Swiss-Prot record:
GO terms for biological process: tRNA N1-guanine methylation. Transmembrane segments: none annotated. This is tRNA (guanine-N(1)-)-methyltransferase. The keyword Ligase does not apply. Keywords: Cytoplasm, Methyltransferase, S-adenosyl-L-methionine, Transferase, tRNA processing. Belongs to the RNA methyltransferase TrmD family. It comes from Buchnera aphidicola subsp. Schizaphis graminum (strain Sg). NCBIfam families: PRK00026.1 (NF000648), trmD (TIGR00088). GO terms for molecular function: tRNA (guanine(37)-N1)-methyltransferase activity. Specifically methylates guanosine-37 in various tRNAs.
């Protein structure tokens, strides 16, 4: 896969389930997800496909510079509007009807619900900003949504795009072998994940909970649900405010609250 060239030719990936186009001046950063882990495997299987569009390839200056001074003055530089605009337009020509997402600290906070919604699009273009940001006109005329992965500043949108792609890819059929692994992840059902244990049975005098060694699958399921609720209640109580609890979950949560009142 060539990471530094835009490609508008027809591809052989007829079975691809989801397409990503990345607008970035640092496509090499994405080797972390194109060559490794479940995303790397999914690309090799043609389950997902990633194309890169580098604004530097759309510049009209010999230095291929992609930064410019902001009108009105102020600190820092902005990404040059024209190369970025052309990169996005070319990505749109490749992925017809794709949704365009700009990674920005001003965007809506990314969560599991948004990930599950965006998968329906099948074609996604991520715009990775740099410097102090991008021209507002690009956002107004080319961007459909702005996403943020948290209330902190990064040097660019590439890391945020990788986070989003990794999370989205997990829900594409065939990427994760065991569907149950995805369904039991934190946030999938609105709760944090339960504690996990593996061999050996004892580490530094700390034992694996006996219930997990019992072989009683119903009791194990109940224990895990209780621990999941307990984790969520103590670490992320905000998640419970928006979750419609099942009868069993309500009973277990009320028991936890009573115990902690003692």
């Amino acid at each position: 896969m060539e990471l530094n060239k835009h490609d508008q030719t027809k591809t052989k990936y007829d079975n691809t389930l989801i397409w990503f186009c990345i607008i970035t001046i640092f496509p090499e950063m994405f080797y972390a997800i194109t060559n490794y882990g479940v995303t790397g495997k999914a690309i090799r299987k043609n389950i997902i496909n990633i194309k890169f569009f580098n604004p530097r390839d759309f510049t009209d200056n010999k230095y291929k510079s992609v930064d410019d001074r902001p009108y009105g003055g102020g600190p820092g530089m902005l990404m040059s509007a024209k190369p970025l605009y052309l990169a996005i337009k070319n990505a749109k020509n490749l992925l017809k009807s794709a949704i365009v997402i700009y990674l920005s600290p001003q965007g809506k906070r990314l969560n599991q619900k948004k990930i599950l919604e965006i998968i329906k699009n099948k074609k996604i273009i991520f715009v990775c900003g740099r410097y102090e940001g991008i021209d507002q006109r690009i956002i107004d005329c080319q961007v459909d949504e702005e996403w943020s992965i948290g209330d902190y500043i990064l040097t660019g949108g590439e890391l945020a795009a990788m986070v989003a792609i990794d999370s989205i890819s997990r829900f594409i059929p065939g990427v994760i072998k065991k569907k149950q692994s995805v369904q039991e992840d934190s946030f999938f059902n609105g709760l944090l994940d339960y504690p996990h244990y593996t061999r050996p049975k004892i580490i530094e005098k700390m034992k694996v909970p006996e219930i997990l060694l019992s072989g009683n699958h119903d009791k194990i399921r109940l224990w895990r649900l209780k621990k999941s609720l307990e984790k969520t209640w103590t670490k992320r109580p905000d998640l419970l405010k928006n979750k419609i609890l099942k009868k069993e979950e309500k009973i277990l949560l009320n028991e936890l609250k009573k115990i902690n009142k003692r």
